[in-house]
Design a protein with these regions (language model features):
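Beta1-alpha1 glycine-rich phosphate/pyrophosphate-binding loop at the start
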Residues: 2-84
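FAD-binding core/adjacent interface of flavoenzyme oxidoreductases
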Residues: 1-7, 69, 73-119
């Protein structure tokens, strides 16, 4: 049987959480997060503390509680979740179960098939 293909659109906070939950539910699934921005799992609720001077390094908003930066490498090594950052979803075809996307830096376009889509 083929592995279930799960695509998560959005990589700020809820997207990576949903992808991580999907991984716990299915260790064999092919999971991909597509994120328009360059940051993954940004704790944006911490911005007031950063602006207020409670810490100096904005990148702390990207870290796990033990200080590990949650970037593409982290999601692959720790959870076997593929990430596409700086990538915008440009179309969703629910009948064909595909998403079309464009890398905002290179301009490269692509298509990904899914069994489950999380937005």
């Amino acid at each position: 049987m083929n592995a279930k293909r799960i695509i998560v659109i959005g990589g700020s906070a809820a997207g990576p959480k949903a992808a991580s939950r999907a991984r716990r539910m299915d260790e064999n699934a092919e999971i991909t997060i597509i994120q328009k921005a360059s940051d993954l799992s940004m704790a944006s609720c911490g911005y007031p503390y950063y602006i207020g001077g409670f810490f100096d390094d904005r990148d702390q908003l990207l870290c796990s509680p033990v200080g590990v930066v949650r970037d593409s490498k982290f999601f692959w090594n720790a959870k076997k979740i593929t990430t596409k950052v700086n990538t915008e979803v440009t179309a969703i075809d629910r009948e064909k179960k595909i998403v079309e996307f464009t890398n905002l830096i290179s301009g490269e376009k692509g298509i990904a098939e899914y069994d489950k889509l999380i937005i």
